Amino acid sequence: MVGNRHPTHDRRPTSGTTAALADSLTGTSDPAPPRVWVMMGHKAGDNSQILALAEALGWPFEIKRLVYRPTELMTNLLAPRTLLGIVRRRSSPLAPPWPDLIISAGRRNEPPCRWIQARAGKPVRLVHCGRPWAALECFDLVVTTPQYRLPQRDNVLHNLTPLQRVSAARLEEARALWQPKLAHLPRPHVAVMVGGDAGPYVLDAEAAALLGRAASAFAAKAGGSLLVTTSARTPAPAVAALAGALDGPHELFRWGPDAAADNPYFGYLAVADSFIVTCESMSMLAEACSTCKPVYMFDLDTGPQLRWPLLTSLIGEVPATSFARRLRRLRFQPLVYRTAMVTGPRRLTRDTRIIQGQLIAAGRAVWLGQDFPPGPPPVPLDDVARAVTRVKALTATADDHRIAAE
């Protein structure tokens, strides 16, 4: 529910003076946690990151949902601290009591967050996940990943993968729910996480059908089954082609806005023995890698470096790329991406090949059709813990300044 605090109780005293008096009388000191606002955006991957950080901090937090105007890009470029880019009557209220900490992601949220800082009349720490559009100096902390190629700065935390909400407790809960439901399928379970178009990557019917064939062959070779899930970005023609190509024991979850309660995503993460993930989704790759199980990336590129020939050992033939698919390289989104990579400012572009390469170098993933090199399994990711440590250091500094002022 919009504006609800998690958990619902709030241990915050009415004033710092009251809290200090109570502490002096009882001989204890239990400072209230900072007031945290989580600024939800329009991208599932961004929202997953900021919720992961908010939950891991262990403090109560308030979710703010914003509805953006079609003109938000223009107004936000003209006024870096403004609410002109949002529809205020349809958005969560942005009013006192102001937060001590804002966790946000995405270009559209930056002007409202900076507007809050200007209005609050007190220090408000701003933590941004991903790649900011404003200058890095505008943020107290930027939690970023390799594809954005941000410079080394004191207020920039470079992680290997995007923050994700996978935890041991969440996986155990999901396993208890979904393992009985999937017990009829032979093991090993191979989870297939399907994304969609992004940057230079195109998930058309041709690619989806090949993914279905290759994943089916992969599971059959191991004597196992597939646990397949699409996502909000998966085009309908790709879903149909994927479903038609699946062979052998499998479960297919077709994502839909009305199917959230039955979404088996965390269940698949919990019970799967290995993963096949479309390579454009950094969030799904991070979530799969967080399990420390084998992760195989399926290439969706439309360029000459496409890695489909690696699938020959699975499907028994060299996968052909149709002329129509090669033409899709010239579609608007892939063309804009490639043009921006050549002519655009470096800090406003991203190169997902960097994070893919680092996952391979760290022994956490390989391309589908390749074998994992010998060696021990990877150690658990510590990206969320690193971010929590940095944020708590920020707020501790803010508390010291507040106490000194009192």
Predicted regions and their residues:
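Active-site and donor-binding regions of nucleotide-sugar-utilizing enzymes
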Residues: 38-158, 164, 285
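Charged active-site motifs of nucleotide-sugar-dependent glycosyltransferases
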Residues: 34-35, 186-191, 225
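Alpha-helical membrane-targeting segments
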Residues: 66-98, 243, 304-357
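A nucleotide-sugar donor-handling region in carbohydrate enzymes
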Residues: 136-206, 371, 380-381
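Leloir-type glycosyltransferase catalytic cores
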Residues: 319-406
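Donor nucleotide-activated moiety binding/catalytic core segment of transferases
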Residues: 242-284
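Conserved catalytic-core segment of nucleotide-activated headgroup transferases in glycan assembly
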Residues: 197-234
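Structural loop-to-beta junction motif characteristic of Rossmann-like glycosyltransferase folds
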Residues: 292-295
